[in-house]
Amino acid sequence: MKNILIISSSPRKKGNSQILCEQFKKGAEEKGHQVKIVRIMEQNIGFCRACDGCMRNGGICVLKDDMAEILKMFQKADVLVLATPVYFYGISAQMKTFIDRTYPIWQHLGKKEVYYIISAGLGEDIIERSLGDLNGFVEHLEEYKIAGKIYAANVMDAGLVKNQRVFQKAYDMGYSV
C-alpha cells in the first residue's frame, strides 16, 4: 500500500481538474492505497514572504497557517499528484503558492513517484507552459519518477471531462499506482 497525496489547485469544487483528481483517487483506493486530496482553495495558506526565516529556523516557516501540516503530509507521501487548471497559459495561482511554500523543506523533498493532472479550456499546446512549471518544481525532489500525465484539453466549462476518455484514464492511472 502506498501513501498518495493529491494537491488539487482548482478553485472550483466541481472543476475539471478536481473531477479528475476524484477519479484518480477512486482508482487508487480501489487498489488499496491510502489517498488524501488537499484542495488548496480550502486551506489557509499565505504567500511566501521571501524572508528566509525558514532557513534560519530549521525549516519552519514564520507564517502560521495550514501549510505546515501539508508539508508533513508531503514528506510522508510515496506518491505525489499535482493537479492544476491552466490559467493564462500557466499553472493556477493556487499551485504556484503551494510550490513557493515548499521552500522550507526544498532540500528534503524526498523520493516521490509523481503524476500530473492538467486541464485547459483551450488546446493541448497551451498545456506546455504549465508542464514546464510543474517539471521545474519536481526536478528539486531528491529522486523522482514522473509516472503518469493526464491532459484534458478544450474543457472550458466545469464538468466537461466527464464526457471524455480522459475521465476513465484518470481512474485507470490511479488504479495503476
Task: Identify what each model region corresponds to.
Residues 1-83, 89-104, 151, 159-177:
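N-terminal beta1-alpha1-beta2 submodule of the flavodoxin-like/Rossmannoid cofactor-binding fold
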Residues 86-88, 121-122:
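Short glycine-rich anion-binding loops that position phosphate/pyrophosphate groups of nucleotides
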Residues 125-126, 156-159:
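Short active-site-adjacent structural elements
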